Each structure stands twice: as C-alpha cells, then as structure tokens.
Amino acid sequence: FYGSLPDGKVKTFSRGGSDSTGSSVARAIHADVYENWTDTSGVLVADPRIIKDPVVIETITYRELRELSYMGFSVFHEDAIFPVRREGIPINIRNTNKPEDKGTWIVESTCQKSKYVITGIAGKKGFCSINVDKDMMNSEIGFGRKVLQAFEDNGISFEHIPSGIDTLTVFVHQD
C-alpha cells in the first residue's frame, strides 16, 4: 500500500499500513464492521510455524489483540486498532482463501467465558531482560520507581516489567 506526501512524492506504508488504512476508512465511513481479509482464518492461539494446528480464537478484545500483536502476532498491526476502537466498530479477521470460515471477532469487551485460560501465545525476538533480585523488595516503598528512574535517567524505555515478591525483571529492546 502507498499514498502520496503533500509534495506529491509517493510513500509506501510500513508493515501494517493496509490494516491502518482499512481501519481509518472504516471509521471515516462509520462502518458497522471492519472486515480484514488475510491468509489465515482469524487470529490463532499460537504461531502455526511453531505449534501444529493452532485453534482459531473466536472472539478477542481490542486490548488482548493489541498486546498479542505487539508481542509478535503478525495477523493485524497493533496500532490499526485505535481508529475503529474509538468508534466502537468491531473487527472481523477473515481468510480470503476460505471465505466460509467465520474468522475472529475483535470487540471492546466480551461476556463470553473463554474455553481456555490463556488467550494466545506470542513471541518476539530482540529483547534483553535485566533481572533484579532483592529480599523483601516488596516491602520497600518506591523500590520499583527507583529501578525505573535509573532507566529513565539513561534514556532507556522499557517494554514489560513482571515482578514477584523478591524479584523484578525489566525487558528492553536490545538495540
């Protein structure tokens, strides 16, 4: 996909450009649904190159899909969710080669109880983890803030911060 800049130069979109374009058009025309046709029958619970025959997720929230996309799911670009989400337009990801498949519905919230405890599994390369272990860390007021302040002071943004009672891990891009 491509467009033109104000000076007339042709500009190709980055990865996810067609997702973002479709989402913006759906919002602009106040569509009832944004159908995104691709080469898979919806959002799968895992990468089929790693897990054999992964199940299609029937319904997922915008937030869940955004997290999974950010962490490596390539079926839909994470930023393309914003235009339709703001307008409450559901997304239906469908398979161009199997139009009879229902695909995956992406909605604001769902009252459906999932068949699974985990929505999906995603992975992304190029991260580094910094592990901090300290006994009684959980009782020290401001400990996490102090750790993050060190990153901020050095101009380093973080991606994810899981923690436990005595541990804190900060994930950052390796570049």
Task: Kindly give the residue locations of the regions a language model identified.
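C-terminal catalytic "cap/lid" subdomain
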Residues: 1-175
